[in-house]
Amino acid sequence: MANMPRDDAAARLAPAMDTSTSDLPSFGAPTPIRFSRSNQSLAEDFMALSFVLESGRQIPRISRFEGPITVALAPSAPPALEGELSRLLTRLRTEAGIAISATAYRTNSPAKITIEALPAERIAAAVPQAACFVVPNASTWQEFIRQRGRVTSDWASLTTRNRAAIFLPADASLQEMRDCLHEELGQALGPLNDLYDLTDSVFNDDNFHAVLTTTDMMFLQIFNDPSLQSGMGQADVAARLPAILGRINPTGGVVSSINLANRDNRAWSNAIGRALGPNMPEGQRLEHAQAALNIAQRSNMRDARLGFSYYALGRIALARDPDRAAAAFASAQDIYQRLPNTDVQRAHIAMQIGALALARGDMTAALLQSTTALPIARRSENAHLLASLSMLRATALEGLGRGSEAQRSRLEAYAWGRYGFADRSLMQIRLGEIANLAPNATQAARN
């Protein structure tokens, strides 16, 4: 289940952009960032993802689809989503080795996985705070509504997966629909949990990663390995992991005993969830963000949760206390620099640090931050971040008197903005806000 990113909440309420437009920018052939992982860490993360639900409930046994898997888009899905699904299915076949293919939508003979697009308000009414979600043993929204609360819709009760339905927001940007597609299809095919301490996975509610990563593909390859099967418990799966990982990640080293202890700090998770949740006054959100940071420090967290605590605090403090936000972003960047596989996190923080530099008139620093982060945003296929960084770079170049370069970067910002934002007017407002951070900013971003 994908939580609603706070900075994109307004995008879901805006009129939908025409995502069927043929000249929307494309990322082309995927070139995912390659993350380096030990087999020991993969084994422990896999077990934590596979035997616990996001709510904290234990899953007694794994369940999965057995045999070839078919996926169908319901007629409500925008045409542009078909191309995104095709790219994703190709990756799942080539990177995760899953026998999966698209098929035509049929009500009388449904695919194993059906993808339906609905108004965001209907999704939020059914599952508050979720931008999108996946449910078992259903193929339509009506079927999901009929069986809500029954044991058939409980992931933890399954012994095998036969059908699943994914519900995406039809009135969102193409990027948000695609991001939902990646996370929900990933959960339909594999683990059901999210872990905040993962740095290289979409199975993490920090929303840094937009698409399934190479690490996620390894998790899915493990989950669907022939030596595993539906109904296996923790001990059986753990016993088979060393051989599986030795085969699919031969440079990852050996797996010793696997630590199965619960890694979730529920007090921290609750505090960060409240800080990022909707419909809460900013002052209270700031209090919850500070509480999450305090818990992380008291608990001696040295993983991504500490970095994310600082990042969340910085985002929330930005409007009312830029100095406090700047200090929080600097701390977050320092922590992520010490952790492996955090290029994407550092690109997001670079956007914030660069924007603060722009606001104080330091065009050189803003240009450095944006130029460094842009290649990571492109490889991680985050159009929203690409558009924002491109506008940051354009404004810095303008301030340095490099007008022709600024115009090229500005045009790139608007091109990717059409993919990353739900509405053209919202895109212009957001990108204009970045341009207007600079002292004596030109109004070129509004033209």
What does each model-found stretch correspond to?
Residues 319-322, 353, 360, 400:
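Structural motif corresponding to the intra-repeat A-B loop/turn of tetratricopeptide repeats
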